């Protein structure tokens, strides 16, 4: 059964804090997106929450608003959250890989023409839902 995006977000933040590689809210949003995309490509769902097309890419509003007080600063928080090992084995390498990237490179990647964010943002506009099937098909 899928988790809530906020629980996956807390897991990501906790892992990055413990690993001494804290991330910003922008990075968190992109990592959540890459996790969901990888799950969807395997016909699975990491979380049921919907991404919206915002100016700087796909965003889970509930997660964004919880951590927006940090602005562009790193989120250094620890949570006592454990994921099912089947989830962790997929999620951990994504976190470890994507947190190394420049967040603006991830923004550029999600904004590429033809990808899911670009289709929704440039078609319907800001804050519209990006359907999971489109994320699966277009990334």
Residue ranges and their predicted role:
Residues 1-139:
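Domain-edge interaction signal
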């Amino acid at each position: 059964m899928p988790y809530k995006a906020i629980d996956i977000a807390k897991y990501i933040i906790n892992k990055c804090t413990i690993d001494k590689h804290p991330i910003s809210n922008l990075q968190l949003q992109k990592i959540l997106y890459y996790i969901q995309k990888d799950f969807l490509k395997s016909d699975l769902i990491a979380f049921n929450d919907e991404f919206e097309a915002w100016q700087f890419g796909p965003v889970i509003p509930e997660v964004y608003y919880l951590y927006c007080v940090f602005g562009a600063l790193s989120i250094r928080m620890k949570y006592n959250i454990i994921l099912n090992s089947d989830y962790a084995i997929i999620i951990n390498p994504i976190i470890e890989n994507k947190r190394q990237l420049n967040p603006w490179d991830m923004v550029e990647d999600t904004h590429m023409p033809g990808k899911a964010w670009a289709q929704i943002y440039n078609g319907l506009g800001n804050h519209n839902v990006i359907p999971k099937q489109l994320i699966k098909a277009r990334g």
